[in-house]
Amino acid sequence: GIDPNYRTSKPVVGDHSGHKIYGPVESPKVLGVHGTIVGVDFDLCIADGSCITACPVNVFQWYETPGHPASEKKADPVNEQACIFCMACVNVCPVAAIDVKPP
């Protein structure tokens, strides 16, 4: 699953749709973790969509990631500021790719 310490153990290597990207990133095979409040490990995400369905405040949007070995799209936490910390996404993710931490 996602490393719950990624916010301090991984360097910030970029910014995407208003949230940080934690590296390393070597596109298209290694995409890192997207988000700080709601972190999605893009290298674990298999795009089954359960988090998108479960989230009551629409934190996630699909993001195309052609060429990634796990899946060709990811659940991107573009609206992480809207998170109400219900943990529905964490609880339904089949590969434990999501970590939520209030700011």
Swiss-Prot record:
Binding site for Zn(2+): H19, H34, D76
Note accompanying the cofactor annotation: Binds 1 [3Fe-4S] cluster. Binds 1 [4Fe-4S] cluster.
Cofactor(s) needed for function: [3Fe-4S] cluster; [4Fe-4S] cluster; Zn(2+)
Binding site for [3Fe-4S] cluster: C45, C51, C93
Chain intervals for the UniProt region annotation (N-terminal extension): 1-36
A Pfam entry, by short name: Fer4_10
Keyword terms, alphabetized: 3Fe-4S, 4Fe-4S, Electron transport, Iron, Iron-sulfur, Metal-binding, Methylation, Repeat, Transport, Zinc
Domain 4Fe-4S ferredoxin-type: 35-65, 74-103
Modified residues (N6-methyllysine): K29
GO molecular function term, any single one: 3 iron, 4 sulfur cluster binding
Transmembrane segments: none
Xref: InterPro entries: 4Fe4S_Fe-S-bd, 4Fe4S_Fe_S_CS, Fd_Zn-bd, Fe-S_Ferredoxin
Binding of [4Fe-4S] cluster, residues: C55, C83, C86, C89
Protein function: Ferredoxins are iron-sulfur proteins that transfer electrons in a wide variety of metabolic reactions.
Protein name (record): Zinc-containing ferredoxin
Organism: Sulfolobus acidocaldarius (strain ATCC 33909 / DSM 639 / JCM 8929 / NBRC 15157 / NCIMB 11770)
